[in-house]
Amino acid sequence: MKYPKYYIGPMSKNVVDCVMKHGQQHSVGLIPSRRQVDYCGGYVNQWNTRTFSEYVGDTVLLCRDHGGELQGKDPDDGVESFNEDCKYFDLIHVDPFRASKTIKDAAERTIQIIKQLSVQNSNLMFEVGTEEAIFKYEPEQLTWFLTYLSMELTENQFNQIKYAVVQSGTRLDLSTRTNIGNFNNKRLDKFIQVVKSFDLMSKEHNGDYLTDSFDVEVRFERGLDAINIAPEYGQVESEYYLEGCKKDGDLFERLFVICYNSGKWKKWVKDINRISQDQLIMTCCHYVLSDQQFIEEIKSNFPNADKLIQKRISSKLKLLNEQTKNYCI
């Protein structure tokens, strides 16, 4: 199998369609979070795990992003979600860190989950570890974590693990569309050495807003194997509607009210008084793209929206591919 160097969040149907088309010529993965697509539905196109998988087919590699307890829309143990993931996804990111107090606790939960899921589907691949925003760890801690997994899992089970998440300093500010993480190249080097020592591939999360400054390429030059990018692609669509609605004061106000009332900005914005109406829309518009109110009141005013949006998304995918194509996994 040719493993993708970049994985894209399915922020909307337009993003999914563009990734599928891109996947006809290039290796790429889709990384639905549980809030986007889950066994019980999600905010992206009303897809559930099965219908999403059936729509995408085998055009791209499907990876559950942040699978597990407390990762869905409502608090749960993640079991039902994992059971469906086993049937339809190629790769599952096992991430119990949100429910873990220590890295040992996370390791024990990871082991338990992998043991259970490998029985249900022996062809499943796994990604382990998590991003800095959820649980920060050092290279030495990742060494301990992976060593513990290798000792407690069977050889076959451990061999199903393909990726370990590294933390070189990424953090997103959706309101300003910037990556405000403090990138540390020496830290990345240490993480990559750790991961390679276990014959695994390194993967960085929150790789948004790095392509234009060639910071994605910098990471691959140092040996990074794969990167996740999500909100940035949803914001391409948000930007299109924001630009269009700003030409009509009433339409802009309706878009703002829909976004504000969704409450989805609260995850990303601590003090709403510090951002503009435009920034609030850019922060959370992608969450409401499939809502009936948005479709009727906003999208209906833009008959050629999907075609124009997909053109922008495809251009961004081409640029990402250009910056990563010379690096081999």
Briefly describe each language-model feature range.
Residues 19, 65, 128, 219:
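Conserved, mostly hydrophobic/aromatic
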Residues 34-120:
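Active-site beta->alpha loop and helix N-cap motifs at the rims of alpha/beta catalytic domains
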Residues 29-30, 61, 91-94, 225-231:
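Short hydrophobic alpha-helical runs that function as membrane-insertion/retention elements
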Residues 1-45:
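N-terminal capping/small domains of soluble enzymes
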Residues 63, 93, 127-130, 203:
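Generic enzyme active-site microenvironment
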